[in-house]
């Protein structure tokens, strides 16, 4: 018989840096999950992706056990890393902060493909390009 799910928790945690401090501790604590168990597993699984923010979906079961799925980093984080930006533009329509090639857009789209609801890489590329535009990044062909 399958275990009964009592909750799902979605968090974005820096890779390899999960600690029992907020936001992780309180979110897991209210569902009665072993916080140290989660932080150790998460840090071990994401140690190779240091410096990235990793979205994670934690499924909590009735017996207080849990399972979790890590996703690919958000598109904005990947764009900032590819262009070595601190942050996007405060006024993306007026101030442009960087230029990005379509090859870089394709690379990020291929990395994000498993988590995007896009049928093709081209559709994924247009999603990534839209995110880049909203950050004040100009896409060049």
Curated annotation (Swiss-Prot):
**Is-annotated flag, keyword Ribosomal protein?**
yes
The Gene Ontology biological process terms listed for this entry are: translation
Give GO cellular component annotations, separated by semicolons. cytosolic large ribosomal subunit
The answer, when asked if Heme is one of the entry's keywords, is no
Pfam families listed in its UniProt record? Ribosomal_L11, Ribosomal_L11_N
Instruction: Give the Gene Ontology MF terms in alphabetical order.
Output: large ribosomal subunit rRNA binding; structural constituent of ribosome
Give a short account of its post-translational modification.
One or more lysine residues are methylated.
Which SUPFAM superfamilies does the UniProt entry name for this protein?
A: Ribosomal L11/L12e N-terminal domain (SSF54747), Ribosomal protein L11, C-terminal domain (SSF46906)
Q: Which family does it belong to?
A: Belongs to the universal ribosomal protein uL11 family.
User: Could you tell me which PANTHER family the record lists for this protein?
Assistant: 60S RIBOSOMAL PROTEIN L12, LARGE RIBOSOMAL SUBUNIT PROTEIN UL11M
Q: HAMAP family in the record, alphabetically?
A: Ribosomal_uL11
Spell out the subunit comment: Part of the ribosomal stalk of the 50S ribosomal subunit. Interacts with L10 and the large rRNA to form the base of the stalk. L10 forms an elongated spine to which L12 dimers bind in a sequential fashion forming a multimeric L10(L12)X complex.
Q: Its biological function?
A: Forms part of the ribosomal stalk which helps the ribosome interact with GTP-bound translation factors.
Q: What is this protein identified as?
A: Large ribosomal subunit protein uL11
Q: Which organism is it from?
A: Clostridioides difficile (strain 630)
Q: According to the entry, what is the taxonomic lineage of the organism?
A: Bacteria, Bacillati, Bacillota, Clostridia, Peptostreptococcales
């Amino acid at each position: 018989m399958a275990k009964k799910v009592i909750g799902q928790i979605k968090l974005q945690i820096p890779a390899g840096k999960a600690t029992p401090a907020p936001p992780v501790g309180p979110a897991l604590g209210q569902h009665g999950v072993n916080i140290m168990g989660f932080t150790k597993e998460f840090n071990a699984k994401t140690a190779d992706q240091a410096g990235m923010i990793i979205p994670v979906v934690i499924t909590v079961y009735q017996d207080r056990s849990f399972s979790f799925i890590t996703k690919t980093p958000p598109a904005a984080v990947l764009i900032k890393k590819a262009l070595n930006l601190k942050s996007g533009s405060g006024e993306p329509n007026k101030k442009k902060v960087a230029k990005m090639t379509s090859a870089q857009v394709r690379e990020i789209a291929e990395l994000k493909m498993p988590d995007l609801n896009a049928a093709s890489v081209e559709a994924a590329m247009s999603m990534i390009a839209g995110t880049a535009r909203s950050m004040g990044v100009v896409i060049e062909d």
